[in-house]
């Protein structure tokens, strides 16, 4: 990055940190390290290594590594300040426009090379995790990311490393508990990992309905009879007459709307969905839950599709 651009971006970042009053709480050495790290993250060629940070700092990379690993500064102050700022921006936009707040949750794995069994210094907090993208165990760091969104504004609220000391369900539940009640009807968007009774109820207590993917072996109770979701879909898909063709982001899907009980959920909507060209294919079946039964099929799928404005 040219020097003039570095100076420009440094001044901009410094002013933003100043607006958050962080310059009052952190000494200059901490602010300078943060500015160097932030500039490095947003320039081309960033690889997530301390050597990248050193390129935009007057300090050696070992000094920056020491700051990150052992530096005497309260990183929770930075995290809490950023969270308050994100809440203020997103909730103010919701109050101004009447548009819903979306709390979007997902997790990802930063893959690392598996260390030798004789390695003296294996990568800290790296474990084997089940990768849904690769369909197998993957070695690396896993993190849970939480975004808040309203009216096209999308901001990172939290990024929590998962080190198996606390479950991902508990991580998300703790985040739900700390969120203020939004000024309008709002929604928690997630994949099937997080559509648990525990999380749904916690978000409901904070003013958020849940819209999320469901595993196809979840139990439904159509017409009062207990039936696995995929078995119920197989019965319905003998004919297209039970389904409605809808369009989401220029893609067409056959969708059946179920409203009723699930285990642990008294009343919700479940959408059974097949791509137009894969109708009746069990491997193409997808299911989505909405605890807001007032939403139309199109609204539910449109809201859920909004989670893919995401970050990975």
Regions found by a protein language model. Name each.
Residues 1-78, 83:
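Gly/serine-rich nucleotide phosphate-binding loop at the start of the catalytic core
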Residues 1-22, 26, 30, 34, ...:
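Single, function-defining residue in the core of a domain
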Residues 38, 50, 61, 99-104, ...:
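A common structural microfeature
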Residues 70-151, 252:
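Active-site-proximal, Lys/Arg-enriched surface segment
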Residues 36-51, 84-91, 128-136, 230-234:
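Short N-terminal helix-initiation segments at or just after the protein's N-terminus
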Residues 50, 76, 94, 309-312:
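Residue-level signal for secondary-structure boundary elements
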Residues 53, 146, 210:
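A residue-level signal for conserved active-site and pocket-lining positions in enzyme catalytic cores
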């Amino acid at each position: 990055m040219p020097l003039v651009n570095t100076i420009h971006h440094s001044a901009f970042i410094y002013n933003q940190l100043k607006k958050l009053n962080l310059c009052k709480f952190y000494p200059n050495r901490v602010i300078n390290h943060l500015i160097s790290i932030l500039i490095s993250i947003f320039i081309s060629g960033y690889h997530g290594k301390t050597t990248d940070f050193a390129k935009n700092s007057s300090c050696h990379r070992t000094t920056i590594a020491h700051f990150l690993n052992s530096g005497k500064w309260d990183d929770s102050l930075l995290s809490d300040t950023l969270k308050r700022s994100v809440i203020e921006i997103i909730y103010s936009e919701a109050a101004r426009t009447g548009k819903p707040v979306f709390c979007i949750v997902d997790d990802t794995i930063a893959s690392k090379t598996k260390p030798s069994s004789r390695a003296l210094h294996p990568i800290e907090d790296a474990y084997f995790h089940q990768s849904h993208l690769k369909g197998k165990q993957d070695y690396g760091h896993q993190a849970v990311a939480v975004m808040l969104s309203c009216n096209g504004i999308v901001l990172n609220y939290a990024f929590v490393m998962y080190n198996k000391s606390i479950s991902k369900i508990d991580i998300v539940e703790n985040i739900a508990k700390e969120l203020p009640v939004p000024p309008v009807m709002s929604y928690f968007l997630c994949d099937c990992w997080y559509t648990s009774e525990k999380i749904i109820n916690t978000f409901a207590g904070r003013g958020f309905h849940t819209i999320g993917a469901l595993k196809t072996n979840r139990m439904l109770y159509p017409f009062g009879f207990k039936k696995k979701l995929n078995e119920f879909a197989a019965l319905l898909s003998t004919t297209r007459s039970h389904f409605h063709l809808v369009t989401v982001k220029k893609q067409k899907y056959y969708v059946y709307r179920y409203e009723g009980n699930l285990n642990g959920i008294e009343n919700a909507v479940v959408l059974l969905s097949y791509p137009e060209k894969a109708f009746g294919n069990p491997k193409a079946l997808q299911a989505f839950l909405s605890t807001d039964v007032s939403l139309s099929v199109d609204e539910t799928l449109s809201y859920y599709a909004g989670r893919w404005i995401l970050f990975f």
